[in-house]
């Protein structure tokens, strides 16, 4: 009697980088769908038409070689770079267990943000043994030709973990703010952060080119 062989599965991290174009992600996903690969995680970013796509898949060992071969041919056809990394079951479960960690949002804003500004902020994060999950630009694109007197730059850093010393982190961020001449906001990422709320700054037009109190009075019909 023939014994049924148990199908083994494995995780593969697929990394795609290169010039972005319409349909690129769809082309990659069509190959994964062809082999019924399970998507465990996915992330994509596009900076100045340069794509960075990461997909963590789980597929059976009989198909993994075919998946990588087809993806490699498709990447060559599209003119992008592709790489593969095996992820063990232990590594994957360790990553899953991290989802219970606390999350914080650090927002920094200034008239412009330099590499030195961002370095100062990320050093504070590193000193607290926290990880950066993502960085997102919140403000619009800045022209290098047209002069705009009302230029602002703001980025949001999504952090994972618990600060070693929250009070010290706040103090270090305050010191950074004074030395770098930028403003910051640090808050725990939970349901209360996403609730609608009103924040009013009375800053004598330092950052906001109007008087907030006067504008609120107009809205209230005062």
Q: Where on the chain are the PLM-derived regions?
A:
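A conserved regulatory-domain signal marking ACT and ACT-like small-molecule sensing domains
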Residues: 1-196
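Active-site neighborhood of HAD-like aspartate-dependent phosphohydrolases
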Residues: 195-198, 207-222
